[in-house]
Structure formats: C-alpha cells, structure tokens
Design a protein with these regions (language model features):
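Well-ordered, non-membrane alpha-helical segments in soluble/globular domains
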Residues: 26-30, 84-91, 139-140
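Charged, low-complexity, helix/coiled-coil-prone segments
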Residues: 22-37, 73-83
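Short, well-ordered beta-strand segments in beta-rich or mixed alpha/beta enzyme
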Residues: 1-25, 63-73, 106-141
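Glycine-rich beta-strand-turn "strand-cap" elements at beta-sheet edges
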Residues: 1-4, 28-65, 102-119, 142-169
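Short amphipathic alpha-helical segments
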Residues: 77-103
Length: 169
C-alpha cells in the first residue's frame, strides 16, 4: 500500500505540528514548483500521529533500515498490549540494542490516523542485519506464550521494510 514514508519526531504533539508546518513553509517558499511536482508524483497519503510508549535507541541515528509493523488492535485492550510489550518483550529488544543487533526499537500508540492502532519498529545498520535480527525476534516470540496473547489483542497487521535514505536528528 505504501511506497514512501515521511515522518517528523518531536517531544510533544504541539512541537510536532510546529515542526511539520515549518518544514512545509520552507519547502513552499524555496521551490513551489518542486513541491507541486512532488505532490503530483506522490498524490495520496495517510496521516498518522504516534506517541512513543516504549523503546530504546530512538534518540540517536537509527541505521540504514527499519522494519515497521502496523497493528490493528482491539481498542478496549490496547493498554494490555502496551503492558505486554513493556514487560515481556522490552527486555529482549533492549538486549538486542545493547548487543548491537539492533540500533533501536519502538512501540507507539495511535493518536491520529486511520485503522492502525499500534506501531512496532526495529532498526539496524542495513537490511541484511535487520532481517537477521527480525528472524531472532520471531524465533523468540514463537517460544513465548505471551506473544500469542498479543496476537489476540492486535489480530491483524501490515509489515514494511524501509530503507532509511535521509534522516536529520
């Protein structure tokens, strides 16, 4: 469904919206024709605002590749999903960041957007390292009964691998 992602990070929703407007205003002032051409080429989009619930390593450079899992969840049980990630999965992800297998990981909650209610991300140096780490995560999850509980709360998802082409802290 998606082929490109553009995102902004900030310490609050107000700061996020201010940063997004500033970037948009600068792009329009610099080259309206180029912005129009970009809009013609990438002529549809979905807007989401996410809030970080848990994660590690997101305050520094994330590496060259990201694996994102966009979850459709039972809204009444989202808090339970958050608690599971923090208690059952965060220690594994944190260790993978400490060991260098991952550059970062994150678990985010939906603030604004469409059907996806939670977003899990992992990043690594490159796609090969990312997929190796992802395989280790899947193997660990298959042995963890709490992973099946998470699957009952968030029973549908879409997976994307992103090559990070440009990132400014």
């Amino acid at each position: 469904q998606w082929r490109r992602v553009q995102y902004f990070r900030a310490g609050s929703i107000d700061a996020l919206l201010t940063a997004q407007k500033k970037v948009g205003d600068q792009a329009d002032a610099k080259n309206r024709k180029l912005a129009t051409e970009f809009g013609r080429i990438c002529n549809s989009h979905d807007d989401y605002i996410w809030r970080a619930v848990a994660g590690k390593g997101n305050e520094r450079a994330r590496g060259g590749a990201s694996f994102s899992v966009y979850y459709v969840c039972d809204q009444a049980r989202e808090g339970e999903a958050d608690a599971l990630v923090k208690s059952a999965f965060a220690p594994m992800y944190d260790q993978m960041v400490a060991d260098g297998a991952l550059k970062s990981w994150g678990w985010n909650e939906h603030v604004v957007g469409a059907q996806y209610r939670r977003l899990a991300t992992i990043t690594a140096t490159d796609v090969a390292s990312l997929m190796k780490a992802r395989s280790a995560i899947v193997a660990a999850m298959e042995k963890n009964p709490l992973a099946r509980t998470l699957d009952t709360i968030c029973d549908s998802h879409a997976d994307y691998i992103w090559e990070i082409r440009s990132e400014v802290p």
